[in-house]
Every structure is written in C-alpha cells, then in structure tokens.
C-alpha cells in the first residue's frame, strides 16, 4: 500500500489510534501491535511530564510517532500552553489541537482552534486540528499552517459512524494541500473502510477499539479495514448501472 507523507514523516499505516478508555495500560502495546498503527495520540492531561513512573508513555513503542493532544483545553490560549509544555517535556513537535468549550456534545470550537493553529505553526509545530467539517474553516486551517485537517465523523466517543459523510466528502474534494484525517465517532471497521474508500488519507479512532470486547482483535480488524478501503480507493470503483447487465453474454449459448 502507498505510504502517507505527513508532518515530515513517511508512514506505512494510515490508522492512528488513541490511548484512553482501556481497561488497563498493559493491553495497549498489544493493540498497537495488532493494529500496526504508527501514530499514537495521548491526552497531555494523562501524561505526567515530571515522572516516567507508571506513565502512559511507557506503554508506547519507541518507534511509534507520538501525537499529544490538548484535550481539556477550552480555548486557543489553553491549547497553546499545553502544546508548549508538551514540546518542552520532550514529546516532540507534533500536536493535535482540541479546543472544546461545549461540555455536552464535545464539539470543537473551530475559531479558537484556528487561532491556536496559526500560533503553533509559526513556532515550528506540526499542527493537527480537530474540527467541525466546514469547508471555509478547513481552508483557514490550511492558510494557518496546519499539517492536516481532521474533521469529525460524529461526536467524539459516540461510535456512531460517519454522520458528517457528505461534509467530509466536500473537504476531500476541495482540500488538496494537506491530508484529510477523519477523527472521532468511527464505531466499526466498516466506518473506517468507508472513510478510506471516500478518499480520506487516514483515520483516527479510540473508543471503538478500547471499548470492544476484544480490543486486540478489533485493532487488527480496523487495520484490515483501513487497508482495504485505501486499496479500493486507489483501484478505482466500477461504474454503476441503472439496469442489470450480465457478466457473461447469453447470446448464442443455446444454439
């Protein structure tokens, strides 16, 4: 499968996974292995930046790319502060911006996220903004220096699938400068496959794997789904027909 060039790196896997909601941290390395994910996102509020003891980072392989996120930030100022703390603590220059002041639906504030993106991109961060799928805002993220655009498929943690499918299709069609990563709401491997068939460059998910009865097996299922969806997109779909059309012609068969 073709590689994903993003944030100054070349990746084999187009499946990004999160680290929350697992029954224990011990299962995380096994999920990373089964999913073959290379990009692992971690909420900075779950990371003890002053200690390596019983730290979530201890369970993430050294060859994985760490994508810290600013979960808990309510505005641009708080997101920027968390990003700078992350970089100072040695967590790298990749940052996923989450700026959410809505505590009920946890929908991202595009305005505050764009402000944070512009500030951090100028400071040398590769910024991955979590956003509501709006075309004009997506263009503003690109202009602000985002390394990718990350539209939500459904409210975070709901496992409801691609409820914003038509909006995401518009972003895929119109935003060519940076990768499109579908983030949040993906509940089943078929959702991930569909996102990749649509032309998304990658998907990021957490709850669907972490809350599965068998997270290790589910990680593998998502790996296969993402690969299948990407290959189907690259292969190009056959044309749809209004009427039935036999695969083998019947003319002359019964002479």
From Swiss-Prot:
Catalysed reactions, as listed in the record: [ThiS sulfur-carrier protein]-C-terminal-Gly-aminoethanethioate + 2-iminoacetate + 1-deoxy-D-xylulose 5-phosphate = [ThiS sulfur-carrier protein]-C-terminal Gly-Gly + 2-[(2R,5Z)-2-carboxy-4-methylthiazol-5(2H)-ylidene]ethyl phosphate + 2 H2O + H(+)
Pfam families per the UniProt record, alphabetical: ThiG
GO cellular component term of the entry, any: cytoplasm
UniProt keyword terms in alphabetical order: Cytoplasm, Schiff base, Thiamine biosynthesis, Transferase
Family stated for the protein in its record: Belongs to the ThiG family.
Annotated organism of origin: Clostridium tetani (strain Massachusetts / E88)
Encoding gene (name): thiG
Subcellular location: Cytoplasm
Catalytic residues as annotated in Swiss-Prot or TrEMBL: 96 (schiff-base intermediate with dxp)
GO biological process terms on file: thiamine diphosphate biosynthetic process
Pathway note: Cofactor biosynthesis; thiamine diphosphate biosynthesis
InterPro entries: Aldolase_TIM, Thiazole_synthase_ThiG, ThiG
One MF annotation (Gene Ontology) recorded for this entry: thiazole synthase activity
Purpose of the protein: Catalyzes the rearrangement of 1-deoxy-D-xylulose 5-phosphate (DXP) to produce the thiazole phosphate moiety of thiamine. Sulfur is provided by the thiocarboxylate moiety of the carrier protein ThiS. In vitro, sulfur can be provided by H(2)S.
Main location: cytoplasm
Keyword Ribonucleoprotein attributed: no
Gene3D superfamilies: Aldolase class I
Quaternary assembly: Homotetramer. Forms heterodimers with either ThiH or ThiS.
Binding site for 1-deoxy-D-xylulose 5-phosphate: 157, 184-185, 206-207
Protein name listed in UniProt: Thiazole synthase
